Amino acid sequence: MWLGKRLARLFRALLAQEAPDDAFALALLKGEERELYLSMDPRDRAHGVRVAKRLLARYPEAPEAVLRAALLHDAGKALRPYRPWERVLVGLLAPPVPPYPLRQGLLGAFQVRRHHPLYAAERIKDPEVRALVLEHHAPQSLWGRRLHEADREE
């Protein structure tokens, strides 16, 4: 089951051409968050919107900060070019790599895959949004777990 989901997600990353609902996202985001969101690859923006909408449908009481974190949780992938073939390869392999210095080439792609929550959190000013983005792969809080679950359902 896990492998099937993983392969489906990798093919979507490679082939996806879905236009993100930027109007939905920009209506929720604040200040510099909008610029950060717009710097993201359209695939990552569309994914963030789907995660935010899934959370909102499941938890209508979701705090705005949670929805903003959902929209920005993969913003760290925008730190360097992250090509479709790199997304597929690093989705299959995940060697331990340090977050810094950020490298070019394939090593940099592995860094982005592993450390994108950190890279995104470092660019977000709101402490609540920052904390949720940082924990979206290793949730510590209730809303962090809910964000993680909504992200994993992709």
Region roles according to the model:
Residues 31-154:
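Divalent metal-dependent catalytic cores for phosphoryl transfer on phosphate-bearing substrates
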Residues 1-36, 139-140:
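Non-catalytic interface/linker regions that flank or bridge core catalytic/transmembrane domains
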